[in-house]
């Protein structure tokens, strides 16, 4: 699972998901990509599940790039705990994505194989996405 090696602070505010992605919204490495259409938090488990699904489908030949990294800690309070006494402890990591962000890129494979692999990865994501091809 992906997570930062070290961070400056253990806990973060939740923040809000408004606007669109101005960075990381163009294909840089591969020929095909999976692009988000709505804002969300994507967990490191979901990122890894998508990556594994794509790798298993492409087998040899193709190259995959993961363009997002989970750098936001999500805290969770223990079950049946009374209110107060501070914030919970960090439980898992998420990547904050906005509409337009590229999640995965792929190259070195025919379009039909890339489309199939990326659609399987898209089914692992908690949001609507689209398949795009670089010009």
From Swiss-Prot:
Keyword Chloroplast listed: yes
Family annotation (InterPro entries): Ribosomal_uL16, Ribosomal_uL16_bact-type, Ribosomal_uL16_CS, Ribosomal_uL16_dom, Ribosomal_uL16_sf
One function term, GO molecular function aspect: rRNA binding
Keyword annotations of the record: Chloroplast, Plastid, Ribonucleoprotein, Ribosomal protein
Location in the cell: Plastid, Chloroplast
Keyword Transit peptide: no
UniProt GO cellular component terms: chloroplast; mitochondrial large ribosomal subunit
Intrachain disulfide bonds: none
GO biological process terms held by the UniProt record: mitochondrial translation
Domain of life: Eukaryota
Position of the signal peptide: none
Family: Belongs to the universal ribosomal protein uL16 family.
UniProt cross-references to NCBIfam families, sorted A to Z: rplP_bact (TIGR01164)
Family matches, as PANTHER family: 50S/60S RIBOSOMAL PROTEIN L16, LARGE RIBOSOMAL SUBUNIT PROTEIN UL16M
Complex formation: Part of the 50S ribosomal subunit.
Protein name from the UniProt record: Large ribosomal subunit protein uL16c
Lineage, uppermost ranks: Eukaryota, Viridiplantae, Streptophyta, Embryophyta, Tracheophyta
Gene: rpl16
């Amino acid at each position: 699972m992906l997570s930062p090696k070290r961070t400056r602070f253990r806990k973060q505010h939740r923040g809000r998901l408004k606007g669109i992605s101005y960075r990381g919204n163009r294909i840089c490495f591969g020929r095909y990509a999976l692009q988000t259409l709505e804002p969300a938090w994507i967990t490191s488990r979901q990122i890894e599940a998508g990556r594994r699904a794509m790798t298993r489908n492409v087998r040899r030949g193709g190259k995959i790039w993961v363009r997002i990294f989970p750098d936001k800690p999500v805290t969770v309070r223990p079950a049946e705990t009374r209110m107060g006494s501070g914030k919970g402890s960090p439980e898992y990591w998420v990547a904050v994505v906005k509409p337009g962000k590229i999640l995965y890129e792929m190259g070195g494979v025919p379009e039909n194989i890339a489309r199939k692999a990326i659609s399987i990865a898209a089914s692992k994501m908690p949001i609507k996405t689209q398949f795009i091809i670089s010009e």
